Curated annotation (Swiss-Prot):
Transmembrane segments: none annotated. Residues 511-578 are annotated as: Disordered. InterPro entries: Gal_mutarotase_sf_dom, GH-type_carb-bd, Glucan_biosyn_MdoG/MdoD, Glucan_biosyn_MdoG_C, Ig-like_fold, Ig_E-set, MdoG_OpgG. This is Glucans biosynthesis protein G. Belongs to the OpgD/OpgG family. It is found in: Periplasm. Pathway: Glycan metabolism; osmoregulated periplasmic glucan (OPG) biosynthesis. Involved in the biosynthesis of osmoregulated periplasmic glucans (OPGs). It comes from Pseudomonas entomophila (strain L48).
Length: 578
């Protein structure tokens, strides 16, 4: 019923004022709730709107003194920790900021989400100490930040340590307790390693939820933008011995792409035992990651040692609904690197755990030649078989695990590769002197709890396959008492050194097939068997006495066996021109 104003019931003045005040309070609560409820949908709406517009490249507002500076000068610009965001608040998380400089020459917008507002964190030059770098505070007061760091007392309760950094394109790095910064993750990769050139989407704006005093996680939203893509991301950071980042993404394409990289990782590999340094170096290895690990949807585990090739190398591993993949640093002893400054043994592995089914696609590995360790030359990502349509959202959710405890990433039922050693192939002559024979040798150590429990004389065998560019001249498997595992030695004769050579190996053993347990007979089966037995006894009684009964057949066959896979699959590519 519509009530006409002229017949509406009269409300006393006091009650009317109370009702109006209650209404105002309710509106205030709803408004605060709506702001506090800022979520991925809000960022996705911005991404969708951007996708319908023409791309505008970010404009640099950086004075030449900052844009043209060298790395050493950029390092002189120091953020003052006492001026960190939330420095005086009781929250365990704090934020510090990167100043613009060098190639970090475009600002990003950084917002804070609180219980009652969303507000930009403005650039403030007083938060920095510039050393002897000349600058005009008035001319740069609206400069903007290049990125930010997340601080958290991960190692000591009274010390704020960097645990996450977001700087440049869509890159971010994360560490756990006792880690050193190593490899990076990215929001999205487009046309990586294609002749047309790679496109690097960038996070242009961030929204960070101010955490409560007892919160153990930090929520960061990010808006992605590039000539052919836009996207909304939610990153939930959970620091600990292993630091986790839960990623929710909703991406739109502005235009078609040839190769899409989901959950991309970027790392560095210069040399290691499987590809020793060409120049004499006291370090046995120098890398942020040493191999790509893949857990396929069918349960198979694969390990691919990394290379620093002379030519660009791209490998594609077909996988349907991957259970996980990542770039790992398995060698964890100081003696593996012998570097007091860079501590490569403390650099984390990063493991990606997809949420839901990702369908058919490939895990792609890109290896780029590099002459030194300052260049990230390794990229790994998931590439879907079916590319999304332009303008339609696609979502990929996953967890990033940053860890130095790689044994947690292995199946307890399978062994894994501890190390891959490469050497010039040789043979021992009658005088016991070894002589090179023109082959290349690989020694692969497989270890794991399942192998350690096997007696040394267990009949373990190798299953080896190589491409058509090599011939296997030795395939030798021995028990390794030092590791309580098995060492596989392969010597290969490469046909054409100008071509790459693929090889795979895994360890197997034969185990008896368990006979199926007989099913219990039902009452009907027992009755039928009793009737058949009585009928047989009657027929036997009617036979002539001189007719002998038939002898039972004897069996001398060996027990049936089946192959049991004992290890992950070692998959290696010997680069061309080596």
């Amino acid at each position: 019923m519509i009530v006409s104003p002229c017949i509406a019931p009269r409300i006393p003045g006091t009650r009317l004022r109370k009702a109006m005040l209650a209404g105002v309070a309710l509106v205030g609560l709803l408004s605060a709730g709506q702001l506090w409820a800022f979520n991925l949908d809000d960022v996705a709406a911005k991404a969708k709107d951007l996708a319908g517009q023409k791309y505008e490249a970010p404009k640099s507002n950086l004075p030449p003194v900052f844009r043209d500076m060298k790395y050493a000068d950029y390092q002189k610009i120091r953020f003052l920790q006492e001026k960190a965001e939330w420095a005086k608040d009781k929250t365990p998380f704090k934020l510090s900021f990167y100043h613009q400089g060098m190639h970090f020459d475009t600002p990003v917008t950084i917002n804070e989400i609180t219980a009652n507002k969303v507000e930009e964190i403005k650039y403030d030059p007083s938060r920095f100490e510039f050393g002897d770098v000349p600058h005009d505070a008035d001319a740069t007061k609206n400069l903007g930040y290049a990125g930010f760091r997340v601080l958290y007392p991960i190692n000591k309760a009274d010390k704020q340590d960097e645990i996450m950094t977001l700087l440049g394109a869509s890159y971010f790095r994360v560490v756990g307790k006792g880690h050193r910064y190593g490899l990076s993750a990215r929001g999205l990769a487009i046309d990586t390693a294609l002749p047309s050139g790679e496109e690097f989407p960038r996070f242009r704006e961030f929204w960070i939820e101010k955490p409560k005093p007892k919160d153990k996680h930090l929520v960061i939203y990010a808006l992605l933008d590039s000539p052919r893509s836009t996207g909304a991301y939610k990153l939930t950071l959970r620091p600990g011995e292993d630091t986790l980042v839960d990623v929710k993404s909703r991406v739109y394409l502005r235009d078609n792409v040839s190769r899409l990289g989901i959950a991309p990782l970027t790392s560095m590999y210069l040399f290691g035992p499987n590809q020793p340094s060409k120049v004499m170096n006291y370090r046995p290895a120098l890398h942020d990651s040493e191999g790509l690990s893949i857990h396929a949807g069918n349960g198979e585990w694969l390990w691919r040692p990394l290379n620093n090739p002379k030519h660009l190398a791209v490998s594609n591993f077909s996988v349907e609904n991957p259970r996980g993949f990542g770039l790992l640093q398995r060698q964890r002893d100081f003696s593996d690197y012998e570097d007091l400054d860079d501590e490569y043994e403390k650099r984390p592995s990063t493991w990606i755990e997809p949420k839901g089914d990702w369908g058919k696609g490939t895990v792609d590995l890109v290896e780029i030649p590099t002459a030194d360790e300052t260049n990230d030359n390794i990229v790994a990502f998931w590439s879907p078989e079916k590319l999304p349509e332009v303008g339609k959202p696609f979502e990929y959710d996953y967890r990033l695990r940053w860890t130095i405890k790689e044994d947690q990433l292995h199946s307890p039922e399978l062994g894994w590769v501890k190390q891959t050693l490469r050497s010039t192939g040789d043979v021992k002559q009658s005088n016991l002197i070894r002589q090179a024979d023109g082959t290349v040798a690989f020694l692969v150590d497989f270890i794991g709890p399942n192998l350690a429990t096997l007696p040394a004389d267990t009949a373990v065998r190798s299953q080896v396959s190589v491409g058509d560019n090599a011939e296997v001249v030795e395939n030798n498997l021995r028990y390794n008492p030092e590791t309580k595992g098995w060492r596989l030695t392969l010597r290969l004769k490469v046909q054409d050194p100008k071509k790459a050579t693929e090889m795979r190996a895994a360890l197997l053993r034969d185990v008896p097939v368990e006979a199926p347990k007989p099913a219990k007979d039902s009452k009907q089966d027992k009755a039928a068997a009793k009737h058949a037995h009585a009928k047989a006894e009657k027929a036997k009684a009617e036979q002539p006495a001189e007719q002998p009964a038939a002898d039972a057949a004897s069996t001398n066959g060996t027990p049936a066996t089946t192959e049991k896979v004992l290890t992950e699959t070692w998959s290696y590519q010997l680069p061309a021109d080596e």
